[in-house]
Amino acid sequence: MNAKKIQLIAIYLLLAMGVRAQQFTLSGKVSDQDGNAIELATVSCLEQGAMTMANLKGEYSLKLQSKDSVVIRFSMVGYQTKTRVLRRPRGDQKMLVQLAPMEALKEVVVTERRRQTTGTEQLDVKNIRQTPSTTGNAVEELVQQQAGVSTHNELSSQYNVRGGSFDENSVYINNVEVYRPLLIRSGQQEGLSVINSDMVEKIGFSSGGFEAKYGDKMSSALDIHYRRPTRFEGNAQASLLGGGIYVGYASKQKVTTYDQQSVAKFTMSHGLRYKTSRYLLGSLETKGEYDPNFLDYQTYITYQPNERWSLDIIGNISENHYNFQPTDRETSFGTMQNVKTFKVYFDGQERDIFRTLFGTARLTRHFGKNSKVSLLYSAFHTKEQETYDIQGQYWLDDAQTQEQLGVGTYMEHARNYLTANVHSLKLMANHKAGRHDWEAGVTVKWEKIEEKSREYEMRDSSGYSIPHQADRLDMIYSLASENDMRSTRIEGYLQDTYRMETGGEKPWHLTLNYGLRMANWSYNKETIVSPRISLAAIPSWNEDMTFRLAAGLYYQAPFYKELRDTTTRNGQTVVTLNQKIKSQRSIHIVGAFDYRFRMMERPFRFTAEAYYKLMDNLVPYNVQNMKVVYYGENMAKGYAAGLDLKLYGEFVPGTDSWITLSIMSTRQTINGVSVPMPTDQRWGVNLHFTDYFPGTERWKMTLRLAYADGLPFGAPHRGLEYQQFRAPAYKRADIGMSFLAVGKPDATPSLRHPRVWLGIDGLNIFGISNVNSYYWVTDVTNHQYAVPNYLTGRQINGKVIVEF
């Protein structure tokens, strides 16, 4: 037995030595064309399933099995992928590789597959034009499909993030914060957003735990960067819901920057968009003459005379008109055993105008490739008018017994006017020093807002005015506001991104971002301090994994709407501005896990994020359709906790698809009573799926599905404590089919060789009646009935897109 054991051990050792002899070690360095190290570059051998990442010096080491030929792949976001073949490698092999920048490619497509080492996720803008759309705001609709984000109105481009309101989301274009109109109360009134998707190069989105450079909002940050054209380019599109044209130009004169990039000395982009939702609004239950017209023009101009100086200018003009003359409406609602019908005949009309001007200018001085200082000026002006006089005679009946449950007349009146001007001056600096990436900024904002509003609603039920008083005649709702606000806001931040790695043969790659933000507002004489920190770790034992942790103290600095406090006497509500209001406050803790893997020989990524937000100094609010009405006082505290899951990848080769699942609980305590927040969506599922017809890339399909829990609601003009009901779940499916009629899918379009897409979109293809809000009918006994206001039905939209 001992001899046999010795023989077995000897055979095993010989086999092990043979296997070891077939292995080899590949090491070297990955750099750019100037010899600078490319940190975290990926070095892989796909056929052996082996992969590693270069360290912060660009150095790498990888153990592989020796074969007749071994294919090695070097890749990094922003650089061309390079492949090398080794013939019968043995022992230790050295390989130095230089990667060329992507600018040398004919067409650059930036995808979402790069490693996420901060709280900001890079979203893919590829094929955004082929996605079915109801609002014409493709970027916001892309954000609405992300994990933790929800919307319950396909007519609006606004969104809620992890239980926050519409006003808790900051939006930046080229480092300048942008604003939205203040009087918008419904999705029908919304026009085109300030973001022109044809001009977008990069989209960064954070649903929590974002960096100090992003402003004082509690929910999310959307960071948009516009593209500098590299040649003459453009597109034109038309559909039943509107159209637009975009043209970009780059001069032939080039400038070599400090980082050895060749850029055009002068570029300009122009975009003109038109939107009309008349066709879409025709599917609503309220019939009438809809006349919405939304027009938007935008330009982006850059000038860089030399490597030291550059100038960027953005200009935007938006003119939105919404005119509506309702005629009648008939709604059936209730259960199968208890069906009710609500019928209304209307008189009157609504006429709204939202006119917006926005512009920025940025002058940048470059001090080498690692340092620059920028001075930015921006101006925002909006003039808004909302006027309507609408009278309706209504009947509420039991559909089975024909019993009349309510009959009456109501009159709604509004004369709302608002003018707002915001000017800002910002000085920001960027400096890279070794493994540190510093950024700092100081902003001064001058704000001026004037409002004059008068609203009332009168109801008469069975000959009695509601609410019925024996000694006086009261309106069910009456509001008056005449206010003027002038203020100065000073903001500043300092942050650093530090990249490091642990020691050892297989180090951990760490990215630490930390910063401090401060702000002072002259109106309430408040100073806020917001520290923020995040850490991302790529473990040595699996470089396809990333662990992320973020924490910070976040504030929601009040703007005009949060200041509007109300007092009611004898049925008349008067709006005053609360000068003692404080910023809402939230402590964020976010833990995340990313895992990149291959399935069906295609790349995928799974992301899980758990979060908890502890909030105080809250200003409670009601949501009436799309209008957020605040209490005007810091009188609540609350929390939001949840889990967001996302699976992203190529379910079909060469396409991007994803599915998200969000679970959330958010509550607030008002006057000792715990109630769900108005945006308490307990769960939500989103699917974005892209496919090609078998055997061809000319036919393309995009499917969008949304299934989300309903939101809490209650009778209007009452406190949140009485929101004891929950709306039905929001369910919607949109599908878009596109056919490339002219041109080649893989060729860059031009004036001589354009690409022409023909498309058809099925909007709400299952014809699901989603509830937008409720109209409350009150009889003389003060019994109330909630009549649902349904959103759009099934519609077909045709479109043509020409790219050149």
Predicted regions mapped to residue ranges:
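Short, acidic, small-residue-rich periplasmic hinge/interaction motif at the N-terminus
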Residues: S31-D34, A41-L46, R73-Q80, P89-P132, ...
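Transmembrane beta-barrel wall of Gram-negative outer-membrane proteins
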Residues: L241-T276, T286-Q325, R351-A379
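Face-selective signature of the C-terminal outer-membrane beta-barrel domain
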Residues: Q304-N320, Q349-N524, T607-A610, W658
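Gram-negative outer-membrane beta-barrel transporters
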Residues: M500-T502, K506, Y611-L614, Y631-G714
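C-terminal beta-signal and adjacent terminal beta-strands/loops
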Residues: Y707-P716, F739-F804
